[in-house]
């Protein structure tokens, strides 16, 4: 609850949107590179502290970003959902899955080997994240090359352009205030982990 509120406050400042727009602008012509970067970040969040419902603010934010980069909203959903989901699948130190499971084992008299759990989690994390990135990247390349290859219906495509085409056109400057907010944001995640 607190984490969701914190994410909402940071989102309301516009720092996340301005930061992502800045990255997209720097990657102009190489927009595909933003997908694995974001998916790995979401995946690390999923693996370390169980980032799942905390990703809700990112759907709208990334939808506008992905449409501006020449993709569709399905790429944004895949980036967030599969990124965070693959992290949760490969939980390493996630207190909500790994921590609870280890406590449950101790409760029935089985002493878990933390090293093995970390290794298995890391292997699952790497495999699921890599495969998720592959799937989203393959679809994104297809949509970028041919807008007609999207799985969205014509009505959904029109709605996407009406909703996010306008949002993508308004550019936000990436100010020093935004940079400071994102540094505090990143620092808080490091402390949580």
Residue ranges of model-derived segments:
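Core transmembrane alpha-helical segments of multi-pass membrane transporters/permeases
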Residues: 1-17
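Transmembrane helix-loop junctions in multi-pass membrane proteins
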Residues: 11-16, 45-54, 97, 193
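Hydrophobic transmembrane alpha-helices that form the pore/transport pathway of multi-pass ion
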Residues: 23-89
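Membrane-embedded alpha-helical segments of transport systems
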Residues: 45, 81-94, 120-134
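Long, contiguous bundles of hydrophobic transmembrane helices that form the permeation core
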Residues: 115-193
